[in-house]
């Protein structure tokens, strides 16, 4: 068996090959891309003709290079960069660092400590596609939120009437009116009929007349005014920001359609959607982040640990503390937090479990985290046994005093 450390960069890879005893067999720098992968395979073939006898350590689990390594049949371990940095300090504390040295470090790590790390999951291409779409969809939502916050901040500087007229600046009503009247002077010229026409063109069908009157009253109310030149400049930036948010709304809707199509064709989609609080979009996010490799999570605890919902115990001497995990998959944790919130409004068992934790003194987010932790365990059981969610089975034995789940 041979062990290879791969210290990757954007344009090249430094690799170090060693045997079971830690003896160096080869080391070199390979270019990124097809020629580099060919060189990698040539080095491997010289020392280990069987791909099963090749163990690789690398500080990423994504990209075409990693895909090529796993497709070749090598055992690939994605090691957290923080773990690599701590491992470096284990051998020397001088602070010295080099790409070639890090490659050797990674090879040593998977040679001696790979039992403490997980190999890259063997997820299907279908779930990888779902993850890409779900992350892209979420990225666009985060981008829209940033632009909406910037718009709100700008309107506070010169156009407070717009903030009084619209609670949600990313809503179609707000975008339609602000696109036509990006300054208070423009707003003063808007008649009720023009506002009504803009709302109708944006897609509103109900309460057109009453809503148009409300908007006109808010926009024409007396307010502090900026200098005309400043207001005009702000108006130009508002018009541009409104156009960006409107386009983001269209792209988010298109990605939702694409994501729903991919999710609904996945073999596990019915199981995910059977759980309370998981719809198409949220279910797709959770599925994409967990993956569909049936061997990745051997127990419910390992799935909970990866999700970051299970408590973390810190004990030393007579001291013992149970804390929340902060090193976690942020996207997955956020999705489970939303899932738990939705579940307590749809599942009597989840609601009762939440109420138990609140009654025991937990804060809202602590109780919500406990519900999310329990839901992850339920999901694991459903996937393991290939069965849909059942309310009675899931919660009948949990109507007791909460434990450290909410830490």
What is the predicted function of each stretch?
Residues 1-407:
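A detector of single, family-specific signature residues
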């Amino acid at each position: 068996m041979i062990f290879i450390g791969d210290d990757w960069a954007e344009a090249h890879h430094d690799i170090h090959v060693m045997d079971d005893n830690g003896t160096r067999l080869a080391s070199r720098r390979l270019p990124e891309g097809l020629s580099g992968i060919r060189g990698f395979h040539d080095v491997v073939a010289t020392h280990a003709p069987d791909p099963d006898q090749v163990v690789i350590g690398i500080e990423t689990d994504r990209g075409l290079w990693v895909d090529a390594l796993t497709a070749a049949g090598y055992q690939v371990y994605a090691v957290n960069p923080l773990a690599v940095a701590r491992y470096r300090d284990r051998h020397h504390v001088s602070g010295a660092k080099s790409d070639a040295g890090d490659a050797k470090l990674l090879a040593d790590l998977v040679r001696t400590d790979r039992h403490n790390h997980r190999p890259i999951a063997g997820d299907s291409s279908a779930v990888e596609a779902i993850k890409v779409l779900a992350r892209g969809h979420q990225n666009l939502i985060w981008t829209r939120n940033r632009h909406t916050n910037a718009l709100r901040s700008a309107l506070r500087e010169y156009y407070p009437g717009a903030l009084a007229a619209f609670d949600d600046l990313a809503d179609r009503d707000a975008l339609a009116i602000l696109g036509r009247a990006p300054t208070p002077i423009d707003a003063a010229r808007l008649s009720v009929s023009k506002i009504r026409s803009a709302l109708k063109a944006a897609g509103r069908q109900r309460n057109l007349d009453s809503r148009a009157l409300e908007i006109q009253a808010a926009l024409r109310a007396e307010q502090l005014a900026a200098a005309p030149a400043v207001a005009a400049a702000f108006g130009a930036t508002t018009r541009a920001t409104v156009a960006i948010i409107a386009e983001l709304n269209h792209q988010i809707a298109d990605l939702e359609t694409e994501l729903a199509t991919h999710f609904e064709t996945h073999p596990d989609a019915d199981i995910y959607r059977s759980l309370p609080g998981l719809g198409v979009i949220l279910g797709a996010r959770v599925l994409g982040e967990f993956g569909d490799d049936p061997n990745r999570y051997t127990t419910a605890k390992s799935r909970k640990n990866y999700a970051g919902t299970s408590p973390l115990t810190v004990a030393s001497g007579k001291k013992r503390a149970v804390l929340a995990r902060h090193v976690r998959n942020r996207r997955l944790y956020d999705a489970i937090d939303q899932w738990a919130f939705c579940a307590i409004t749809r599942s009597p068992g989840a609601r009762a479990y939440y109420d138990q934790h609140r009654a025991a003194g937990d804060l809202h987010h602590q109780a919500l985290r406990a519900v999310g932790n329990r839901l992850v365990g339920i999901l694991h059981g459903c996937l393991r046994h290939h069965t849909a969610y059942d309310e009675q089975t899931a919660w009948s034995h949990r109507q007791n005093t909460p434990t450290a789940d909410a830490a």
